[in-house]
């Protein structure tokens, strides 16, 4: 999953980027509203974390422009202003959720999971497929009730394929949700992650369509 983080506070932004990356998200971090609009136009994101008080263009202006273009990207707004009017303005401008600073990283992560779950149409917090259970909150995977050790990027690949069962995802689509724009990408990184997942969860779990991509088929 790829997140656009828009936060001008250096200390907070760095902490959020590191924390979210450790949770398995690919994070692009920008520090002003103009840059946010450029990144929104150039990349595909699953969620945006947007501070209200930004230089060059405010978070509310960025949000209104996004919604005005018909963009349905989930947006979690951050603010230091804890008044009802501020919250109402943010939500009425199109925010999906609202978090007041200071906040706990665990709460932010839980709100992100809820927004992503809502967008994918899931009501249950865990994902089940055959004898596999994946829990995004704990980053845990079990097979036939037994824990399976999964590396963070393997987990991210598995989550993306499970949330898109029946849909073929190209290597480029998988890479886009694994890496931020600053990361160096090995040419065969996705293939390596797929290979490891097959060894751990079954050779027939992920199907390859040569020249097209990878898919986990829906259960009959």
How does the language model describe each region?
Residues 2, 110-168:
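Short, Lys/Arg-enriched segments at the junction into DNA-binding effector domains
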Residues 140, 145-205, 210-212, 218:
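Positively charged, aromatic-enriched patches within helix-turn-helix-type DNA-binding elements
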Residues 70, 119-123, 165, 182, ...:
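A general structural signal marking secondary-structure boundaries and capping sites
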Residues 30, 128-130, 135, 142, ...:
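Solvent-exposed beta-strand sheet faces enriched in polar/charged residues
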Residues 24, 109-112, 136, 178, ...:
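Short amphipathic alpha-helical/adjacent loop interface patches that line ligand
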């Amino acid at each position: 999953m790829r997140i656009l983080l828009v936060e001008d506070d250096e200390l907070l932004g760095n902490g959020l980027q590191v924390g979210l990356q450790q949770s398995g998200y690919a994070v692009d971090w920008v520090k002003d509203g103009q840059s946010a609009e450029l990144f929104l136009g150039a990349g595909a994101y699953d969620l945006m974390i947007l501070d209200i008080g930004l230089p060059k263009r405010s978070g509310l202006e960025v949000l209104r422009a996004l919604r005005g273009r018909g963009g349905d990207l989930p947006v979690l707004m951050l603010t230091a202003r804890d008044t009802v009017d501020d919250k109402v303005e943010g939500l009425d401008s199109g925010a999906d959720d609202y978090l007041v600073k200071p906040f706990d990283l665990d709460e932010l992560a839980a709100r992100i999971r809820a927004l992503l779950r809502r967008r994918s149409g899931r009501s249950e917090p865990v994902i089940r497929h055959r004898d596999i259970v994946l829990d995004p909150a704990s980053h845990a995977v079990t097979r036939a009730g037994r824990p399976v050790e999964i590396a963070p990027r393997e987990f991210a690949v598995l989550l993306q394929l499970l949330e898109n069962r029946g849909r073929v995802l190209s290597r480029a689509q998988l890479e886009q949700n694994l890496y931020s724009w600053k990361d160096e990408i090995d040419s065969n990184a996705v293939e390596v992650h797929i290979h490891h997942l097959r060894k751990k969860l079954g050779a027939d779990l992920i199907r390859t369509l040569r020249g097209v991509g990878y898919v986990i088929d829906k259960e009959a």
